[in-house]
Amino acid sequence: MQTVRMTTAQALVKFLNQQYVEFDGKQQKFIKGIFTIFGHGNVVGLGQALEEDAGELEVYQGRNEQGMANAAMAFAKQKHRKQIMACTSSVGPGSANMITSAATASANNIPVLLLPGDVFATRQSDPVLQQIEQTHDLSISTNDAFRAVSKYWDRINRPEQLMTAMIQAMRVLTNPADTGAVTICLPQDVQGEAWDFPDYFFQKRVHRIERRLPTKASLADAVEMIKRKKKPVMICGGGVRYAEAAEELKQFAETFHIPFGETQAGKSAIESSHPYNLGGIGVTGNIAANTIAKEADLVIGIGTRFTDFTTASKQLFQNEEVEFLNINISEFHANKLDALKVIADAKEALLVLIDELQVMDYRSSYTVEIADAKEAWETELSRLHNIRFTGQDFTPEVEGHFDGNLNEYVDALGSQLTQTAVIGQINTLLDEDAIIVGAAGSLPGDLQRMWASRKPNTYHMEYGYSCMGYEVAGALGAKLAEPSKEVYAMVGDGSYQMLHSELVTSLQENKKINVLLFDNSGFGCINNLQMGNGMGSFGTEFRYRNQETRKLDGTIMKIDFAASAAGYGVKTYHVTSLEQLQEALIDAKKQTVSTLIDIKVLPKTMTNGYESWWHVGIAEVSKSQRVQAAYESKVSNLQQARSY
C-alpha cells in the first residue's frame, strides 16, 4: 500500500479535487470551489493547504459567513444539485454564522459542504479564543449546533477519521433523496496534524446519481388510481427541475389533459405560457391554480414536499373524494397526506405512467375549466399590472390597514409607485433568459403569482426556509453558476438590511449582479399578517421612536439605499416612477459592474390572497375584539382542513 504524508487539511483539499458526479452519462467535477473567511481557527490549517495546492478548486473570499454559504447554496440550486461549493470559516462566531445557511440548505434539500473550524481536540489551550465552555460537557463546542440543521455531521478529532467522514459526506451530498447541508467540523490543531494517508483515498471517485425506477406494484396502483379520477391536478415541485423532468411533465399534461400548478421551487421548470400551466398554487398561488385545486379529485404531487404554503395549511383541496398520489425520490416526502407512494425519479415515473395510461386511452373530464381559469387569471394579472395610486380615493390591494395614511408614505418615499405595477414592468423589460432570485417578504407571493417565466430555470426562489438576506448572496451564487446570464436579486428593504455583504464579493469577482430593491419602509409582509389577524401595526413599520409616546410610532424613516451601495462601487439608480424604472432597467443591462435600483413603492400595494388560507398561531384569548374574531375565523378554517 502506497501512502502520502499530508496534513489533515492538505488531504481534505486533495480529496475534494477528486470528486466527480455522473448524471445521465454526463460526468463533471462535483466541487467547483470553496468560499473562505479566514480566522485563527482555519487560516494556518485549511488556509495553508489551499495556499500550497488548491488543485482545481476556485477559492473565493466571502464577506459574511452566512452570506457566502447562502451563495454556495444558490450555486448548487441553480446547478440542479449536480455541482456544489464548499465553505470554510473560523471557530466560534464565524462558524455560528453559517448555521442559518445550513438550515436553509437542508430545508431545501440543496447540497452544501460546510467546513467550520473548531476548538482544539487536545484541549491543551482550553479555553481558546472564541470557545464556549459548557460545564456539563467539555466536548461541546459552537459547532454542535450544526447537528440540528445538517443532513450529515461529523467532527475530525484524529487525522485518520477524515477518510470515513468524507466518504459519508459525499454519500449524502450526492444522494438526491437525502441531500442538504453536510458539516465536517475541523479542530484547528487537527487541521495541521500529519498522517500517512493511503493513496487509494485520493483516487478519482465518480458518484453516479441514479434515476430510481418505480416498482411494478406502486406503478400499477398509481395507474388504477388515476384512471378512476375525472379531475386530477398535478403539482410541479422542485424535484421536476432537479430531475430534469420538465419535458415529461409537459407530455403527461398534454396527453391526458391534466393541468398543473407550480410550487416556488418548481416554478419555471416549464414556461408560464404553457396551456396546462396554471401558475403558482397555495397560499401564494393565483386564482387559476387554487380554483382548480379546490375541485380536484386527485392531487398528483411530483417532487414536492407539500409545505403549508403549497397546501394552504392542508385546507386547499376541498373535494370530498380527493386523494393524493405522490411521486418523489424521497420516501419521507412521498409518505405525506396519506398518499399513494411512487418512490422514484420524477422523469422515469412519468415516462412509465405515460406508457401505461396511453394503453387505457385515459383522459381527464375537464372541458373548458382549464382555459377559463387561465383566462380569469390573465384578466386579473392585467388589472394588477395597471394599478396606479390615485390619491384619497385609492383602495390598496391589502385594504383596511393603511388606507388613511398612505399619503404619509407618498410624502416620505417621494413615490406613488404600486408594487404590482413595478413587477409587471420589470417582467416585461428583463431578457427572457434572465434569472430572478428571491426568498422572503411579500415579493415571493407576488412573484409566484405574477411572474411569467418565459424560459426554463430562470425563477430561483428560496422558499423552503424563506431566509431573509438570501437574495443578494443568492444572486451571486446563481451568477457563478450561469455567468453568461443577467441575474436579478428581487429583495425588499427589510431583507436587504439584514444581509447584502456579498454584493462586495460580486464586485471583487467581476460577477455582475443586479439588485432590484423594493423599499416600502417596513417589514410589509408581516405587517399584513399581524393587521390581517386583528392586531394593530406593531414593530413592523420603519419609524423613528416617538419621544412623547416612547414607541416606534414616529415619522417614517427615509433611507437612501442607492447612495449607500454607490459607496461600494455599485452602479445605482433612484426610482420613483415607472418612466425612471424603465430607464434604469435598460441602462443597467449596459453596465459591466453590479447595479442596484432603489425602487420606492407604497406599502399595501402587493398582491393579496386568492382562495387560500394560512394557519398561524393567533391568540385564543385577547382584549381585542378583532383578535378574537380572527381566532374564531381560524377555528372555522381548521374545521375545513385535514388534521395531518
From Swiss-Prot:
The protein's required cofactors:
Mg(2+); thiamine diphosphate
Q: Which reaction does it catalyse?
A: 3D-3,5/4-trihydroxycyclohexane-1,2-dione + H2O = 5-deoxy-D-glucuronate + H(+)
Query: What is one GO cellular-component annotation here?
Result: acetolactate synthase complex
For the ligand (thiamine diphosphate), the binding residues are 65
One BP term from GO: inositol catabolic process
Which branch of life, at top level?
Bacteria
Alphabetical keyword list: Hydrolase, Magnesium, Metal-binding, NAD, Thiamine pyrophosphate
Q: Which Gene3D superfamilies match?
A: 3.40.50.970, TPP-binding domain
The UniProt entry, under SUPFAM superfamilies, shows:
DHS-like NAD/FAD-binding domain, Thiamin diphosphate-binding fold (THDP-binding)
- What does the cofactor section's free text say about binding? Binds 1 Mg(2+) ion per subunit.
CDD domains (alphabetical): TPP_IolD (cd02003), TPP_PYR_POX_like (cd07035)
A GO MF label: magnesium ion binding
Q: Pathway, per UniProt?
A: Polyol metabolism; myo-inositol degradation into acetyl-CoA; acetyl-CoA from myo-inositol: step 3/7
Region entry Thiamine pyrophosphate binding, spans: 442-522
Q: What is its EC number?
A: 3.7.1.22
Q: Where does Mg(2+) bind?
A: 493, 520
NCBIfam families per the UniProt record, alphabetical: myo_inos_iolD (TIGR04377)
Q: What does this protein do?
A: Involved in the cleavage of the C1-C2 bond of 3D-(3,5/4)-trihydroxycyclohexane-1,2-dione (THcHDO) to yield 5-deoxy-glucuronate (5DG).
Q: Which family does it belong to?
A: Belongs to the TPP enzyme family.
- HAMAP family (alphabetical): IolD
Q: What is this protein called?
A: 3D-(3,5/4)-trihydroxycyclohexane-1,2-dione hydrolase
Lineage summary: Bacteria, Bacillati, Bacillota, Bacilli, Bacillales
